[in-house]
Amino acid sequence: MVNIPSYVFTVVKRLESSGFQAYLAGGCVRDSIMNIAPNDYDITTNARPEEIKNVFRDFKLILTGEKHGTVAVITNGGIIEITSYRLEKGYTDGRHPDNVEFTSSLIEDLRRRDFTVNAMAYGIHDGLIDPFNGRDDICLLYTSPSPRDKRQS
């Protein structure tokens, strides 16, 4: 279902071979289900930022999101954001959480996401993980034609 580019697969396998869970999450899963080529790939993991940095110590890293649990890994294929499973509280700026608490639960991490269609994960061994029925809700994203289109029919 999700076509995983080799550079993304390599990052997932490296996390797993280091003893961590690793799942594609969010928009890349949603887009793949909708038969849209993802623009980027995000990975969610039970590894904490320090552990992610250690696993990818031989890669160039972007650490601007580290306090929110995100470490970006620069690969030959592109930049992959790896984010620790987390819980969030408060959004004073409307975009970034005021408080982040790491968790060991993939389901808790998915629960914090904005929409059910973004609260899905995909594991290379487990396939689709969809605890909130986001796949069923994808049909809600499709809209009817605009009034202009209807008049031209």
Residue ranges of model-derived segments:
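Catalytic cores of the polymerase beta-like nucleotidyltransferase superfamily
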Residues: 1-151
